[in-house]
């Protein structure tokens, strides 16, 4: 079974890099919109994956899960992403999950095809890293369970995950698509996002 895990910060803390560009209410609404898009995409992808899958939201915000059918909530008791994901990994492995796919909750253009590519890449690899547009952060991470790979989300996390996988003797690879790599981390990207949603009836699938 595949476990798609979507970690989300407290809404008022999310997208802090945009604090000078958006007021708190607009920033929070932006985050909710992106989270809902990621959840919808993950739910649609489940029917296309080669093995059964479940979706978990790891967050101190339970309403995000209760508002979304088919989403299971894992409370984030750690208040630190890597610790929260480590705890989530233990819990979903106990539930029978064999493949864990961590998907950032703030990917506005992620598609079903992106998740299929991530799943397919795990056929021949123990670890698959999908970096952000700078090649530094990790927007998605796939791994087989059980796994000793420590989570290292943060600065240069893509490189960290690849180096650590190699040190542990794990087969690892990168995948990258424009929609999976797109990350709203500055004003230019924010304007690109607004231009796209203004010209599209729906996000790309």
From Swiss-Prot:
A GO MF term: phospholactate guanylyltransferase activity
Matches recorded under Gene3D superfamilies: Spore Coat Polysaccharide Biosynthesis Protein SpsA, Chain A (3.90.550.10)
SS bond partners: none
EC number: 2.7.7.105
GO biological process terms, semicolon-separated: F420-0 metabolic process
Reactions the enzyme catalyzes: phosphoenolpyruvate + GTP + H(+) = enolpyruvoyl-2-diphospho-5'-guanosine + diphosphate
Pathways involved: Cofactor biosynthesis; coenzyme F420 biosynthesis
Alphabetical UniProt keywords: GTP-binding, Nucleotide-binding, Nucleotidyltransferase, Transferase
Residue numbers binding phosphoenolpyruvate: 138, 154, 157
Ribosomal protein in keyword set: no
Pfam families assigned to the protein according to its UniProt record, in alphabetical order: CofC
PANTHER family, per database record: 2-PHOSPHO-L-LACTATE GUANYLYLTRANSFERASE
Note in the entry: The exact nature of the substrate is currently not known. This entry has been annotated based on its similarity to Actinobacteria.
Similarity section: Belongs to the CofC family.
Protein name from the UniProt record: Phosphoenolpyruvate guanylyltransferase
Organism: Chloroflexus aurantiacus (strain ATCC 29366 / DSM 635 / J-10-fl)
């Amino acid at each position: 079974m595949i476990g798609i895990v979507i970690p989300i910060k407290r809404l008022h803390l999310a997208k802090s890099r945009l604090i000078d560009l958006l007021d708190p209410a607009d920033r929070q609404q932006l985050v909710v919109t992106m989270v809902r898009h990621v959840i919808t995409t993950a739910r649609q992808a489940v029917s296309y994956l080669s093995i059964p899958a479940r979706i978990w939201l790891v967050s101190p915000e339970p309403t995000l899960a209760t508002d979304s059918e088919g989403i299971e909530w894992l409370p984030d008791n750690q208040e630190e992403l890597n610790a929260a994901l480590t705890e989530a990994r233990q819990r979903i492995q106990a539930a029978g999950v064999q493949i864990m796919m961590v998907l950032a909750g703030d990917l506005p253009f992620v598609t079903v095809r992106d998740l299929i590519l991530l799943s397919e890449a795990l056929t021949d690899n123990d670890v698959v890293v999908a970096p952000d547009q700078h090649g530094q952060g990790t927007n998605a991470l796939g791994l087989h369970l059980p796994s000793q790979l420590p989570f290292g989300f943060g600065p240069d996390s893509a490189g960290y995950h690849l180096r650590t996988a190699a040190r542990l003797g794990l087969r690892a690879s990168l995948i990258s698509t424009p929609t999976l790599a797109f990350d709203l981390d500055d004003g230019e990207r924010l304007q690109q996002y607004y231009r796209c949603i203004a010209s599209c009836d729906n996000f790309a699938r």
